[in-house]
Structures are given as C-alpha cells and as structure tokens.
Design a protein with these regions (language model features):
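Alpha-helical segment proximal to the catalytic Tyr-Lys
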Residues: 117, 161-165, 224
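The beta1-alpha1 cofactor-binding region of Rossmann-like NAD(H)/NADP(H)-dependent oxidoreductases
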Residues: 52-62, 94, 209-210
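Short, small/polar-rich loop/turn modules that mediate ligand/substrate recognition or access, typified
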Residues: 164, 169-171, 226-228
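Residue(s) in the substrate-gating loop at a strand-loop-helix junction
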Residues: 132
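Substrate-binding pocket helix/loop in short-chain dehydrogenase/reductase
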Residues: 88-89, 93-101, 185, 196
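Active-site helix of classical SDR
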Residues: 112, 148, 156
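Short C-terminal tail/terminal secondary-structure segment
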Residues: 137, 216, 227-239
Length: 239
C-alpha cells in the first residue's frame, strides 16, 4: 500500500472529488481526517469525519492541533473544499465574490498556514491543492472562481519554495481538473455535457476517481521529486 502509516487531511471530503480522494487514500493505508461542513455520504474504514468551516482560521488551527495530538503528525494535506457562485461580472454581487474567495482561496491559506510549518517540524509532507482548468485559462461567468483558483496556483508555487527552503522535503503541488462528473455536473443538461466532452481529446468527462488517483501519486513517495507542479487532469482540453 502506497500510503501505509500516513496521516492525511482532506477538505471538502463529504462527497465528490474529496470523498473519492479520502476513500482511495484510506484503501492505500492512510488514516484520513475527512473535513467538511456536511456529513460524509459514505462509510469507509480509517476515514474519520471532522466538521470544519475552512474560512475560520482558529478552527483550522484547532484541527491541526487535534491531528498532532492524536496522531503525532500530518503527512498529507489536500485542500479541496470549494464552491461556485457563477454570474457575469456586471451581475456578480459582493456576496458572491466574497464567499467564493473566502472558501476557495482563504480556506486553503487558513489550513496550510498551520499544517505546513508542522510538516517542516516533523521532517516532511505533501500538500496538494485542488485548482482548476478555469484557474489556468479563465471562463466566462466565473470571475470569482477563476480568480480563486488562479490564486491557489500562485499559493502552490510560493509554498513549494517557502516550505522547502530549509532542506526539509515538504512538497506542494496542485491538480487542475477539467470537467469531472461530480454530483454538480449531473444536474447539467445532456446537450451541454456532450459539448463539454467534445472539448477534450479523449471525448468524455473525467471521473472523481481519476482525480483521486492523481492525488494519490502526488501524496505518495512515487512523487518524491515533484514539487511546485500543476498537474492538469482534463482529458487534453488545452492541447
């Protein structure tokens, strides 16, 4: 098993991408703290639910302290929690902008500001930030989401430099998914799904498990020489 005896925190883990990652990590031997405001939609051995709002900095510190006290370390952090509130810029409200930035960007900062230094103290670790193809290329009607995910990419590259500067192997990478068949996508009309699939070289949408497998690689020792990288998992959307 590739994550045996590893301790992992996965945010936004109630379902979807986060749920797929939490369950795969557990099957690969990790003990997983699955973080979300909503209860988990699955049961999985070695996955522990922890209720948390990532916009609350002190709650993020409390989670870090809890994991350290219970397990003595944190090996893997996946910052996956995120939302969308789409609108054209001229119609986007302050509330829509602030909520997306607070959860998608500030939430990533809030948890990593505590977990990253702990990983340095403990001798290493892997931080994986879930970005998006929208953060790389932008998208009409998603100014807030695009800004938040572009910010996540910037944080990833900054932390890859900051947390490794003392010679401690704390790696920080991002995954930029394309169109993935999550519960949110299942509400999209069939004709649009076909259009999205046609934008890829592989002619289909991705599955949550495919993002989870990418995260497993970055979390494992197989990626021991990979840091500061943005791994695009999008079926060849932007070739």
């Amino acid at each position: 098993m590739r994550l045996e005896q590893k301790i992992a925190i996965v945010t936004g883990a109630a379902k979807g991408l986060g749920g797929a990652m939490a369950q795969l990590f557990a099957r690969e031997g990790a003990k997983v703290i699955a973080v979300d405001m909503a209860p988990l939609t699955y049961e999985c051995e070695n996955v522990e639910y922890y209720s948390l709002n990532v916009t609350d900095s002190q709650a993020c510190k409390a989670l870090t302290d809890y994991a350290k006290e219970k397990y003595g370390k944190i090996d893997i952090l996946v910052n996956n929690a995120g939302i969308t509130r789409d609108a054209m810029t001229r119609k986007m409200t302050d509330e829509m902008w602030d909520l997306v930035i607070d959860i998608n960007l500030k939430g990533v900062f809030n948890l990593t500001r505590y977990v990253g230094p702990l990983m340095e103290e403990m001798g290493g670790g892997s931080i994986i930030n879930i970005a998006s193809v929208v953060g790389e290329y932008g998208n009409i009607g998603q100014a807030n989401y695009a800004a938040s995910k572009a910010g996540v990419i910037g944080l990833t590259k900054t932390w890859a430099k900051e947390f490794a500067r003392k010679g401690v192997p704390v790696r920080c990478n991002a995954i930029a998914p394309g169109y993935i068949m999550t519960d949110m996508m299942k509400t999209v009309p069939e004709d649009l799904l076909k259009k999205f699939a046609g934008l890829t070289m592989l002619g289909r949408l991705g599955q949550p498990e495919e993002i989870a497998k990418a995260a497993l690689f970055l979390a494992s020792d197989d990626a021991s020489y990979v840091t500061g990288h943005v791994l695009s998992v999008n079926g060849g959307m932007r070739l």
